Amino acid sequence: MALTDYTENLILDTLFGVNDVTALGSSALDKNTLYVALFTSETSDTGGGNEVSTSGTAYARIAVANNNSDNKWDDAVLGVKKNAAAITFANAMASWGTVTHVAIFDASSGGNMIAHGGLTQSKAVASGDTFKFDIGDLQITLN
């Protein structure tokens, strides 16, 4: 997964003094929870893509704790951060289509896309299926 333009700018502006770290209250750098979202089309550094429909499908973004105490994310190593716990979506109540991309947001709906990327293998999600990322499947890279 790659960081979006929003996140790259936020990090650079914070590192180089444009943003005061204590004033980041509403930014992704100060969120206790991040949200994993699934897409049926390509995402980009500026956002976009078709997120799986929430209408009658039982789809919702999955909340993932964003702190050191819950161990949901591994420590970054060589510019790579991975999920340290499985991320499991609810059983689909109707077809979600073919999931091709994933993104991380700072809100349960809307919000800012933090990181995004294509799946190594797309997956058609039919009614009754459960979509899951195993430990280490999500890798966010800063390079």
Regions found by a protein language model. Give the residues of each.
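Small cysteine-rich, disulfide-bonded extracellular modules of the LU/uPAR three-finger superfamily
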Residues: 1-102, 106-143
